[in-house]
Amino acid sequence: MAMHLGINDVVVTSKRDIISRPDMGGNISLSVDALNDMPRLGGAVDVIKLLQYTPGVAATQEGNTAMYVRGGDAGQSLVLLDGAPLYSPSHMLGFFSVLNTPHLSGLTLYKSGIPAEYGSSTSAITAIRTRRYMAKEFGIEANIGLIESDAAVELPIGKHLTLFASARHSYTQWLTSLLSDNTAIDYDFGDYGLGFVADLGSAGELSFNTHFNNDDAKADVFIYNSICTLRWWNALSTLSLRSELSPRTTMSNTLYGSIYDNRLNLAIATTNSHVRAGVADYGFKSVTNINLTDVTIDVGINYAYRRVRPQDIMLDTPNNSDRQHIENSSEAALFGSIHWPLHEHINIKAGLRLSLFANDHVWFYPEPRITVEVPVSSALRFWASYNFMTQYLQLVPQSNMSFATDFYLLSSEHTPPQLSHNLSLGYIHEALDGRLRWSAEAYYRYMLNVIEYDSRILEVIAGGTNHEAMLHSGRGESYGLETSIGYSDRAVDLHLNYTLSRSLRQFDAINSGNPFPANSDRKHNISLLTSYKPSPHWTLSATFVYATGAPYTETTALYIGGNAFLREYGPYNGSKLPDLHHLDISATYWFHSRHFERSGLNISIYNVYARRNPLMVSWSIEDNGTDKLYLRERHHIIYTIIPSISWTVKF
């Protein structure tokens, strides 16, 4: 099935497109129902991982599913589930997101031409939608595999109520046992969802959705005689009422709550350290859509009360005073937008968002948005867009992994709101009745008040580290060219993307005030996604990704000073990890059965040629046997080749 995206809606046609063509502004939409032919790596289809095979989304190191969109940092991309923020969308190791795909209906990635109703992000918005329809009969979709198993249920109750439920549980012990010879890791995760849709007749449609996921990990590091335990979780709920006020006017009101919490306990010798961080959002959003003859208008309001625990450090040592601090804030916005087909060959979508943030300080910013589309013909169109975005909640990363040591900070006098100016210009051309298409989009982003953190978790635990003293506020820019070519018919679906880009940062107190590559900088990024159905029984698919290695700061020398090692560093982020690349393949045999709507056996191999893609680099002093010490660089590998087998059934 193929998806062709209009301005506001996805239209499903008879072709098999996995990824829709870009809409007005170059954004991307995915429909879960069209993903059956996608590679089932690890036995499951993951919509968040799929986004890494779309233009402008950089491939990350192994162990990381962070969204680096157009040179933005991980914390500059916001993920929304039915309108509620999902602050930690990845499980540890980066192999899965926290979302159970059968519970979803689709998503849209906004990276330019961002509607005025969305804010709180300076890079990109990923709006994910759960299933909302009245089911006609009871149904189950399940996947049983070696790494994880999941199931989703839909249950109609009468004609006006449908329940949806989903669950996923992992079997990762055999996988984590392969990660290190010096570390014993016990790791588990789970994802759970529950929702309903009720038809209230003339009063409208009421929907509810709740999501919970958790990660539990324990690591015994033998060489350091230490035990580390981690637990982090998301819990969010949304309640929405959609009402038709008139044949041309609809209103949607949503209440939501979202909580993210992470906890790290580290026991080394006789010292126990406890680190806790989190964020809680409680909000309301109302959007009114007015559909006139030729013009569509959206207006609305958004309010969020937010509580943030930046990072509590508690040590089980004598005379220790625990550091506990919780910050509160309010964020409100008024927004409006208009879609106006000014001429047969000119479409305009313009909007304005007025955002207000208050804690110890008050900030107010108008955020203009405009996109102009020029459809030259049904097969060729151009567009240009400008967005001004603000972000008041800031993520402070402390790890390259999808890990529980990152934390959030509210904007303050020392860390003012992040701002970004975003420009883009693109086109798309289609041929062969839409089966073949190619597109290109150039972008430029200028960022103010971006942050860089000069400490790591062990330094924080050691005590005496003041977060604000280790934070630097500066500016950045990113620019690039995204190109894509795709072909789809009833048997073949192929998408090839290439992005040439740079992302730079500049801080007065770092690198002598000179610009340096951002952590998200990837000069070259290539992705390939292909699927082939030689017969109704078989689906063969493959993905390939290549990206320039991530930047890091090299240790050039170690000195012994007193009772500690002193480091000498090279240029800040002046070195790069080896380039990342891997090929993944998947084969599914679909059985014909009178008892099941769909039943298939899948075999997949992640990283077929066992490429050793490093997560990070460390250094150690070693003896070369001649009574001389030398500095050794070590590349840490999480995993290489991962085979999996699973059975999928739907009835």
Regions found by a protein language model. Give the residues of each.
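Short, acidic, small-residue-rich periplasmic hinge/interaction motif at the N-terminus
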Residues: 1-39, 48, 74, 244, ...
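Surface-exposed extracellular loop regions of Gram-negative outer-membrane beta-barrel proteins
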Residues: 261, 309-314, 360, 378-423, ...
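C-terminal beta-signal and adjacent terminal beta-strands/loops
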Residues: 537, 546-563, 580-582, 588-651
